């Protein structure tokens, strides 16, 4: 192989390697696409994106869509949003959808909403096509004690101006539930609620429940209504059971006091009997003393014994007869 041929091969190989590195590092195809679409992005801008570790296709392709839709944007805006961690493609799609629907939405506002964690494209779509939120069954108790369960469907539209810092769907559902419960609870009879379910939606809708939220409530419709438990009867039953237990406790207390009083009286009776026995034991001593002193004669003593014997006989006659002895 001659030196001239070797040199030619080296130059050709080096050129091919240089071209491969160039086309790998510089997105020439993307630059041609942007130029053909009428979006003027220089090669040096694309190289700068590579150096800043920005994927050029993530910037140029959304920029082409925006320019074709009639929205004026530049690479600096999209690149800064990309470096901030935002979704450039979703923001551009949201701007295009808002532009088509005649909704005023700037790039700065859309980028702020996207960086706040909200889906700005879904918000724009919800502004055009309202969303229906269905609540679970909400239970309220009318003044007559009957539980009424209602299910509501809330039609909401996204409020783009309040997407950042506004409350979400959970707050809307909670506020509507509170309004339904208060409306049912203010009715004297549950039948009035069953006859006029639209009264609930009208009352709740006038409360301004969408304040401070990211949505605008368009309508509240009662989808289903049903009767639950008789809460008043349950409460009365529970109260009666509690009163019964209280009365039983008081009766038991009185019974215990009566038993204690009975035992006290028995003790008093035994004490009195002991005193009587003691007094009876002193009678013979007193009689003996009276006989010694001459204050009691012999005949008086004999009469006393006769009276005592007569008393014992009357007691024996008045005593009940044993049935077993009668049978014998």
UniProtKB/Swiss-Prot annotation:
One GO cellular component term noted in the UniProt record for this chain: plasma membrane
Membrane topology, as annotated: Multi-pass membrane protein
Transmembrane domains' residue ranges: 9-29, 30-50
Protein localization: Cell membrane; Membrane raft
Pfam family for this entry, one: FloA
Subunit details: Homooligomerizes.
Name of this protein: Flotillin-like protein FloA
Source species of the chain: Exiguobacterium sp. (strain ATCC BAA-1283 / AT1b)
Encoding gene per record: floA
């Amino acid at each position: 192989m001659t030196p001239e041929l070797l040199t030619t091969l080296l130059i050709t190989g080096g050129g091919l390697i240089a071209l491969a590195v160039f086309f790998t590092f510089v997105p020439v195809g993307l630059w041609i696409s942007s130029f053909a679409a009428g979006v003027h992005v220089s090669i040096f801008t694309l190289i700068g994106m590579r150096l800043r570790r920005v994927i050029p296709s993530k910037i140029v392709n959304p920029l082409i869509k925006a320019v074709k839709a009639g929205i004026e944007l530049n690479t600096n805006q999209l690149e800064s949003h990309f470096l901030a961690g935002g979704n450039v493609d979703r923001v551009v799609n949201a701007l295009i959808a808002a532009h088509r629907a005649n909704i005023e939405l700037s790039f700065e506002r859309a980028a702020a909403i996207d960086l706040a964690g909200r889906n700005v494209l879904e918000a724009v779509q919800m502004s055009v096509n309202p969303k229906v939120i269905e609540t679970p069954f909400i239970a309220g108790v009318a003044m007559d004690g009957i539980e009424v369960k209602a299910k509501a469907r809330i039609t909401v539209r996204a409020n783009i101006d309040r997407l950042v810092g506004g409350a979400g769907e959970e707050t809307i559902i909670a506020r509507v539930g509170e309004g339904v419960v208060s409306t049912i609870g203010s009715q004297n009879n549950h039948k009035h609620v069953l006859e006029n379910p639209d009264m609930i939606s009208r009352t709740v809708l006038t409360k301004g429940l969408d304040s401070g939220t990211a949505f605008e409530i368009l309508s509240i419709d009662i989808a289903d209504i049903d009767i639950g438990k008789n809460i008043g009867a349950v409460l009365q039953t529970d109260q009666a059971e509690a009163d019964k237990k209280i009365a039983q406790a008081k009766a038991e207390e009185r019974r215990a006091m009566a038993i204690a009083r009975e035992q006290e009286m028995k003790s008093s009776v035994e004490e009195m009997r002991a005193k009587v026995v003691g007094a009876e034991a002193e009678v013979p001593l007193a009689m003996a003393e009276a006989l010694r002193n001459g204050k009691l004669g012999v005949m008086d003593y004999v009469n006393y014994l006769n009276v005592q014997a007569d008393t014992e006989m009357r007691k024996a006659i008045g005593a009940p007869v044993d049935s077993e002895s009668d049978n014998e």
